Amino acid sequence: MDHHAQPGQPASAEFFPTDPTGLPEATRPALLELADGDDLHLQIGPVAKRLEDTTVRMLGYNGSIPGPTLKVRQGSEVIVHVTNHGDLETTVHWHGLRLENKYDGVPHETQTPIPVGGSFTYRIRFPDPGLYWYHPHIREDYTQEMGLYGNLLVLPTPVTGRPPTAMSF
């Protein structure tokens, strides 16, 4: 029995694969600058991650942990196509964004989960500037710990009639 398993509970390896053999190495997250109307493809899938002297099996968006950082301008709309090659059904929750309910990523409430091998298309609007994040809302204890999360940077709409303020992100 796995030393982390609780009495009466099966070890996690009985539920989720753990072997990293043959998996691509996880990469660092890319900074993706998206314009209004752009399409983004996010692929969820297993990756190998080196942690000191051990290689472990994790999950990534587009092969990276964390997932890509998305940089958009306030008021933009982006189409996000998510394909699930992960371990279990999933959704993507766009944490803190005000958006259409059907794209909020709450399983069985606002969206049917994306099955393994399936896809879902989100239409995401960015009404407010700020720093946000995205992540699954199914088995968060597992999926986020395995690497499924990423940042969203929403830049404010430039104010007209005044000189722009220097911004460095």
Walk through the language-model features, giving the residues of each.
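Histidine-centered copper-binding motifs that mark active-site loops
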Residues: 1-169
